[in-house]
């Protein structure tokens, strides 16, 4: 982990590892990760790599995160009705790991290649310190600040046309799941579990890592080239089939049934 110290001397991670290693019966533990990427990382662990590791995604409430009227959502948020809106969201948008600089560069490149986007496209930034970024964008920018109200977040997703997540590291981001549930195509770097969520050129666009040119291509493709209605419908369907509460609950039930069956076999 890049956040851990060099390993010289004593550190909390090493002490925690030793305590976990000493747990009796740990070889019978079934581990669950929420992404295939994390499952692959776990399989390389000297501590749990020989255990059963299942992959079950986190669920989303599709009765809450769903499509609503776009025009009404924009009216409630004070966003323009005559522009295509690109959303970036983070708890703290100035966090370098969230890749805001790549989106800024991508917007600059889009405006250079497609000057009409200066008039018909804008960026919406959701999260703390959003106002600090206004001067960085050449496209019009609307900072919404930090929002905690769930219904307002649903309105934000429904108000925009594409959600962009240029994170440099991530697992299975809820923001992508929430946007897709609201019928919003997503564009994101090929990192962590993001490519598991975004099916390239089917419900969004998977971008080459740290490539602002490809990021610009992906955003422009979603807004101007692709069959937008198809992308939107595919995004909603992906969430229903993979991330709905009913689907995830069924997977957990299957794991518990498997664990109980194995336990009874060992008792016999």
Q: Language-model segments: what does each one mean?
A:
Residues 9-55, 60-64, 70:
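A short, active-site helix/loop in glycosyltransferases that binds the activated sugar's phosphate group
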Residues 66-79:
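A short helix/loop element that forms part of the nucleotide-sugar donor recognition site in Leloir-type
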Residues 80-98, 104-107:
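Conserved donor-binding/catalytic core segment of Leloir-type glycosyltransferases
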Residues 114-121, 127-154, 162:
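Nucleotide-activated donor-binding/catalytic signature segment of Leloir-type glycosyltransferases, i.e.
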Residues 168:
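Aromatic "clamp/platform" in nucleotide-sugar-dependent glycosyltransferases that forms part
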Residues 185-188, 198:
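Short hydrophobic beta-strand element within catalytic cores of glycosyltransferases
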Residues 200-201, 205-212, 221-226:
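Conserved acidic donor-binding segment of nucleotide-sugar-dependent glycosyltransferases
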Residues 227-242, 251-254:
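A short, well-ordered alpha-helix in the C-terminal region of glycosyltransferases
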């Amino acid at each position: 982990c890049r956040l851990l110290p060099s390993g010289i001397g004593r550190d909390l991670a090493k002490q925690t590892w030793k305590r976990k290693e000493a747990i009796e019966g740990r070889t019978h533990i079934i581990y669950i990760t929420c992404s295939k990427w994390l499952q692959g990382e776990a399989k390389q662990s000297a501590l749990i790599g020989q255990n059963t590791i299942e992959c079950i995604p986190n669920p989303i409430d599709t009765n809450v995160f769903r499509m609503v009227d776009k025009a009404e959502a924009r009216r409630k948020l004070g966003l323009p009705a005559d522009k295509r809106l690109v959303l970036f969201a983070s708890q703290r948008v100035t966090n370098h790991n969230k890749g805001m600089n790549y989106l800024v560069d991508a917007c600059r490149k889009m405006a250079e290649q497609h000057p009409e986007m200066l008039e018909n496209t804008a960026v919406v930034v959701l999260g703390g310190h959003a106002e600090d970024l206004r001067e960085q964008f050449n496209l019009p920018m609307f900072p919404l600040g930090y929002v905690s109200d769930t219904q307002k977040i649903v309105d934000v997703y429904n108000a925009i046309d594409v959600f962009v997540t240029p994170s440099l590291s991530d697992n299975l981001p809820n923001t992508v799941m929430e946007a897709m549930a609201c019928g919003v195509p997503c564009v994101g770097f090929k990192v962590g579990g993001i490519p598991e969520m975004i099916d390239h050129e089917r419900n969004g666009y998977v971008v080459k890592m740290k490539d602002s040119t490809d990021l610009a291509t992906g955003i422009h493709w979603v807004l101007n080239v692709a069959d937008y209605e198809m992308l939107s419908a595919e995004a909603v369907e992906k969430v229903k089939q993979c991330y709905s509460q009913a689907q995830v609950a069924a997977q957990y039930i299957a794991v518990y049934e498997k664990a109980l069956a194995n336990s009874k076999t060992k008792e016999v």
